[in-house]
């Protein structure tokens, strides 16, 4: 059964899942033409292979421990850690421990290409 997307103005519980984390699945919280928010669940030992996303992204670790693999670095993410990536930057995500993260993807006017950053 698909989870419903949050409506504008609706509070969403993003607290750590604790013992429920091992049975949890990744799900989209909301998607609009300008952004998408996803609760990303990455079990220990599982790696999301290197890929690119057209929009800028942020990842905030809610619980657990994950590693973000970049072309020139590996970043450890633990509860409370936050990272920003430019659009189209190759990256992978690996669960070191069961982890859940808040993924936000920012889209431009066409729903894909990120807005240019001001100078």
Language model region names:
Residues 23, 36-53:
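Conserved short histidine dyad/triad with adjacent acidic residue
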Residues 72-88:
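Short acidic-glycine-tyrosine-enriched beta hairpin
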Residues 1-36, 117-119:
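A short, N-terminal "cap"/entry segment at the start of jelly-roll beta-barrel domains
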Residues 62-63, 78-79, 97:
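A cytosolic small-molecule/anion-sensing beta-strand core signal
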Residues 47-49, 83, 87-92:
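Histidine-centered metal-chelating micro-motifs
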Residues 109-119:
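Short, charged, intrinsically disordered terminal tails
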Residues 87-110:
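Ligand-binding loop in jelly-roll beta-barrel domains
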């Amino acid at each position: 059964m698909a989870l419903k997307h949050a409506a504008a103005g609706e509070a969403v519980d993003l607290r750590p899942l604790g013992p429920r984390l091992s049975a949890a699945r990744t799900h989209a919280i909301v998607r609009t033409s300008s952004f998408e928010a996803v609760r990303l669940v990455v079990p220990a030992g599982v790696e999301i292979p290197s890929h690119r996303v057209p929009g800028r992204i942020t990842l905030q670790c809610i619980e657990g421990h994950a590693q973000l693999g970049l072309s020139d670095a590996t970043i450890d993410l633990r509860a409370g850690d936050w990272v920003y990536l430019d659009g189209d930057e190759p990256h992978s995500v690996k669960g070191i421990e069961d982890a859940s993260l808040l993924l936000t993807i920012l889209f431009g006017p066409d729903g894909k290409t990120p807005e240019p950053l001001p100078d």
